[in-house]
Amino acid sequence: MVGGLSLFGASGAQAAAKPVDVNTCYNCHDNTGPGSDIKAFHVRGSHASINCGHCHTETEAHVRNFNVKPVTSVDQRTCGQCHAEQFNSMLQVNWDRPPKEEKATPTGRTSRYDTLMRPHGFTKEHAEPRSHVFMLVDHLLVDRAYGGRFQLKSWELIGDGAAAQAGAWNILYDVEPETNNQKAFRGQVATAANPVCMFCKSQDNILNWAYMGDPHPKAKWDRTSNVVDFARSLNHALNCFTCHDPHSTEPRITRDAQIQAIVDRGEGTYPYDKEKSKRITVEKVEFRDGFRAIGLLSEPDSNMMCAQCHVEYNCNPGIDAATGERVTMADQRTNLMQWSNVFDFNRRMYEDFKFIDFRNAVTGADQMKIQHPEMEVFWGSKMEQAGVECKDCHMPKMVSKAGVKYTSHFQTSPKYHGYENTCLVCHDDWTPERADYTIHAIKNYVRGKINKAEFWLAELIDTFVRAKDLGVPESVLAEVRKHHTEANTHWEWWVAENSDGFHNPEQARESLAYSMTQSQQGIALLEKAIEERRKAIAKLR
């Protein structure tokens, strides 16, 4: 069951915008001025008839003094004045996906997550995702991010999608607004947030952030900025312009780390499918003398748009794999998309990026913290090879009560759009019941493998403790740590991925089997060393 609040009707509009003379804007914002190419974007797209004043206010002061910036709307309601169906669908709440559903419970995706992932901040709270309209609110609220600084004004607001869209601070309050330091405000919390991790929650600061978050005299914020102040500056989750160019309406990506991977590093849109990468390309377009950049897609591709967030990426400090030194937010590697599937991931982290997220609290093994790698999992899957995109299942074409056909922006599981609008479009000989049955068969199978991999990881850690206590040589422990690193990545990848392996069940099974094998090989090394150590001790008696 889903629900939402309609803010705009078919004719819907907020107060009329004050129009401006677009030619005055074009005098500077052409392909030679400081806001290069804006004119070219505007005149060639379907927004050519939309006046600049629709999205930009306080323009008179800007015309008088270039250093006085106009106010640019980042609120989805601005787009909703024309795109009412898309906007209202974004506000929908999936009442069947409860908030604050912890993954690390006996009935969750991973019952022993806290044991296996100590001392990482995710052990404080690691919840299942819910409707996109809440993604900023949920980030600010999570126990691992701000030490409990930001709290709900009332639990009654937890499901108010319209209030969340209008601004996160309609729902949340700051426990200590007179300070801006990261600290614990309650027990069992962490202060792990930083500005980079918020850029897939909100791009309200897109005009105040230089490419890659590097320090820049024109940028208000960078990777090292005070994260509390940065958080307070945000209001809206998943802005429309993240995927749609506001001037030309062309499909685009705005996540700098993704543009870096595809264009700057030359890895392409589909690194495991070179021919597809040649067909679907990204053109890097720089603005304001290279201050920031966007990536224009050669054709609409919802996989690339969704991959701005539904992807594994570094967004935190870590450890340099070559030197062992601390990697701080000043290092560009703290804003990094590895753009790799699970089988190449650890190798690339060590060889290409020389980055380790943290070390296990018990074994000391190098650990890579995985974030929602839906895109990498989808690469090479049967569905991806068949031409299916994220939108086909999660944002299908719908028809409103008024008969208007539109793309749903209620990003949710196929079930809640109606299987007849998703799975049955291709599987036209199926019933909705069969689609649901098949989906759950795959998810149940993979969840079983996740739990088996988890069991063997826990056994590895427990055996490591016994071995270390008995005085097993460090040379053996060092070798076992390598197995632990591999096993952990190939387990947590699927804990972090949000389809329970449905996006690529064959890869999920192979990867999780590899995790189990790595754990078992590590255990075998330890058991052998334990037996040898016991014999050596017995000889001394």
Language-model features: where?
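Short sequence/structural segments immediately N-terminal
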Residues: L7-R541
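Bacterial N-terminal signal peptides
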Residues: M1-S6
